[in-house]
Amino acid sequence: MLSAISKVSTLKSCTRYLTKCNYHASAKLLAVKTFSMPAMSPTMEKGGIVSWKYKVGEPFSAGDVILEVETDKSQIDVEALDDGKLAKILKDEGSKDVDVGEPIAYIADVDDDLATIKLPQEANTANAKSIEIKKPSADSTEATQQHLKKATVTPIKTVDGSQANLEQTLLPSVSLLLAENNISKQKALKEIAPSGSNGRLLKGDVLAYLGKIPQDSVNKVTEFIKKNERLDLSNIKPIQLKPKIAEQAQTKAADKPKITPVEFEEQLVFHAPASIPFDKLSESLNSFMKEAYQFSHGTPLMDTNSKYFDPIFEDLVTLSPREPRFKFSYDLMQIPKANNMQDTYGQEDIFDLLTGSDATASSVRPVEKNLPEKNEYILALNVSVNNKKFNDAEAKAKRFLDYVRELESF
């Protein structure tokens, strides 16, 4: 018995709680939702209805396209935000110049019965807007008229005397303020002086026109913006270097070591068989010099047998590996033979006279047999090093000289 009583008391308390939270066992008669003309762009003010995709009473789901709206630029599909069905269509297909926010249909829930559902009164909603504008009272209308009189009496002075752009789209804050004070757009563009760029009407201009703020404050703000919209560089002067800094810069430039060009000059003496003509010897020497030049440039300075040597890497890190590091020039001359101590005119040598030696005796020299006769030549070599551009030029020039010095062994 006690358990039954406790169950009943618990059930009553739960019922009171559910009733308090507006939970009922019977279906609730829900009011329909007003579907207004959507704004498909920030600048859209009016639009048209191309077609309705659903008829009255046909259910639709969230995301379905319920109608197609026409703007001044294109035609856009409008999707449903929630599940529901059309209870009544206020604007039929083909309607033009429908203001944004104006009711165009009523939407009910999917489970609602359209026969028993109550629709809002249509007498006052035919030309209603989504934004309800409060009717001004008698006191407020008198106050606005007084402000307008004051505004018309006091001349409006703008900073640049510009006129409002008649083709501009008013900002939402400006449109709302004009609607609250029963001022049309055409009247505002004609009578209110703009302070925005390119003749744009701002909220401060409307407030100054209504007398809610002084016109001087608007002019001051406009002057400040126009004064600082461009960077003033007239007061900027170039910094002049102090004489000490200039002297230090000159001394640093003078302290830089100047690279002097390097030149090598050598005279090499070598022998060649007398049977070889001079022209043939010159041709062979020219080939030898070219070979030495190619060897000095082509062979790397680093030890090629080292495990750290890589020809591809050396070719990449070397500055302009194909450009010459030095230039050379040479002159080949034959040294004439001295067969006797007398000159070509039959006179004795001055050194023989001073030493008292017999010229006839000294002129006869033993000639060894089986020795081929050789001519003596002198090679005057000049090497100009391009060390101002390449740091390895001098080393390769010295390698070239070492290669040519091998002629002295002959």
From Swiss-Prot:
**Entry-linked Gene3D superfamilies:** 2.40.50.100, E3-binding domain
Tell me which Gene Ontology terms the entry assigns under biological process: pyruvate decarboxylation to acetyl-CoA
Q: Which residues carry this modification: N6-lipoyllysine?
A: K73
Residue stretches making up the Lipoyl-binding domain = 32-108
Identify a single GO molecular function assigned to this protein.
dihydrolipoyllysine-residue acetyltransferase activity
- Grouped into one coarse class, the protein's main location is mitochondrion
Gene Ontology CC: one annotated term: pyruvate dehydrogenase complex
Asked if the record carries the keyword Transit peptide, the reply is yes
Q: Do the record's keywords include Mitochondrion?
A: yes
Provide the alphabetized UniProt keywords.
Lipoyl, Mitochondrion, Transit peptide
Matching entries from InterPro entries are given as: 2-oxoA_DH_lipoyl-BS, Biotin_lipoyl, E2/Pdx1, E3-bd_dom_sf, PSBD, Single_hybrid_motif
Record domain Peripheral subunit-binding (PSBD): where: 169-210
Similarity section? Belongs to the 2-oxoacid dehydrogenase family.
Q: Which PANTHER family match?
A: DIHYDROLIPOAMIDE ACETYL/SUCCINYL-TRANSFERASE-RELATED, PYRUVATE DEHYDROGENASE COMPLEX PROTEIN X COMPONENT, MITOCHONDRIAL
Function of the protein: Required for anchoring dihydrolipoamide dehydrogenase (E3) to the dihydrolipoamide transacetylase (E2) core of the pyruvate dehydrogenase complexes of eukaryotes. This specific binding is essential for a functional PDH complex.
How this chain assembles, per its entry, is: Eukaryotic pyruvate dehydrogenase (PDH) complexes are organized as a core consisting of the oligomeric dihydrolipoamide acetyl-transferase (E2), around which are arranged multiple copies of pyruvate dehydrogenase (E1), dihydrolipoamide dehydrogenase (E3) and protein X (E3BP) bound by non-covalent bonds.
Protein name as annotated = Pyruvate dehydrogenase complex protein X component, mitochondrial
Q: Which organism is it from?
A: Saccharomyces cerevisiae (strain ATCC 204508 / S288c) (Baker's yeast)
User: Source organism lineage?
Assistant: Eukaryota, Fungi, Dikarya, Ascomycota, Saccharomycotina
Question: Corresponding gene?
Answer: PDX1
